């Protein structure tokens, strides 16, 4: 059961071969056994989860169930959930109990899925390794000396270790795709605006997007069917006709034009990642796809552009955490200004402070034009590069991460190397394009490698189809970390 797909779990539940209460109990027991070592979950509430499971069993018994009713899911701790501790991986919110549900949480509740708990993450989603969390680092289930990636590292670890059949994540510059690659699972960041951000604690509002993480592309399609939809409470939410992302999964990919950006296959990619990606592309050739070289000349500037714009937005978004309304509050202070300073100094970790400082600097008088405005112009050029590339191809493919997972602690004192983990993912984020990662093999030390698939706007169905056809021909997505296969 722990290795079952969402459809298989749905069949077991609908045929009464297992109840949601029993299924949820099995996952809770597994979390209890393995989480002390992996640290994938921050918060669990067994009684709340089992209450939801009992409600799901009633829905199934009375014929009110959906395909996902009764199936457990883990929620990234960036999503507000009514009555749940919602920390965003920070001391600043270590005592915050959310009084309402994020739209994403509510959507899964409405179809009868069961919330297993809140997963660990980089503090305020700022990080590529899940080492900035106030609750400690998450370990990669394939090699517990390695990072799981970030910022959705807890969600990626939970799915890879079979602590949950699915999880939610968020992606600002690669935070779904990079941990999915490093943990050997599938994850998708939809087109910006397709999934509601209401109740999702903001990092960089023009980049943040929620998406699902699971073992396979088919599972992602089922989850995306629930998550995508217009929400009037989110000013950036897009009003589009509802789409069934499972409809074209089985379609052959013969004739699919795959663009290979020369900038993604240049220096910087490790040889083990290159070998696994080349083997995956060879599999697509066997499936009938054709390849065309494309160019994204401004993508080499994506990381510096991202690390100007995202911190600028974070500087503004995180100004609300001041010790007055909610969250951490300094115990001793001389006056109001001192309260703000001490609360933020105590409540935020070093990486969050670094990005607030960068963001405040680039927005300040005298530097706004030189940095922020220039970065916005380059963002537009990056989007134009993708527009030209998609005139020649249907999808763009390349590596998700330049290396396999690095060791915990290895890059903590080298922020530049840490930021370069997003070198292949941040360009699509800046353009607002959908991107996904699927497992395509292993590199050094038997650590997973991911293939990055970028689609044109609203082409999630085409991306999922291409990923699913690859997964029908291979079994990388079915593999379980050896020490977790029990």
Swiss-Prot record:
It holds the Pfam family Amidase. Keywords: ATP-binding, Ligase, Nucleotide-binding, Protein biosynthesis. InterPro entries: Amidase, Amidase_CS, Amidase_dom, AS_sf, GatA. It comes from the Bacteria. The active site is at 76 (charge relay system), 151 (charge relay system), 175 (acyl-ester intermediate). Signal peptide: none annotated. SUPFAM superfamilies: Amidase signature (AS) enzymes. GO terms for molecular function: ATP binding; glutaminyl-tRNA synthase (glutamine-hydrolyzing) activity. It is an enzyme of class 6 (ligase). Transmembrane segments: none annotated. GO terms for biological process: translation. It catalyses: L-glutamyl-tRNA(Gln) + L-glutamine + ATP + H2O = L-glutaminyl-tRNA(Gln) + L-glutamate + ADP + phosphate + H(+). Its EC number is 6.3.5.7. PANTHER family: GLUTAMYL-TRNA(GLN) AMIDOTRANSFERASE SUBUNIT A (PTHR11895:SF151), TRANSAMIDASE (PTHR11895). HAMAP family: GatA. Heterotrimer of A, B and C subunits. Belongs to the amidase family. GatA subfamily. Allows the formation of correctly charged Gln-tRNA(Gln) through the transamidation of misacylated Glu-tRNA(Gln) in organisms which lack glutaminyl-tRNA synthetase. The reaction takes place in the presence of glutamine and ATP through an activated gamma-phospho-Glu-tRNA(Gln). This is Glutamyl-tRNA(Gln) amidotransferase subunit A. The lineage of its organism: Bacteria, Pseudomonadati, Pseudomonadota, Betaproteobacteria, Nitrosomonadales.
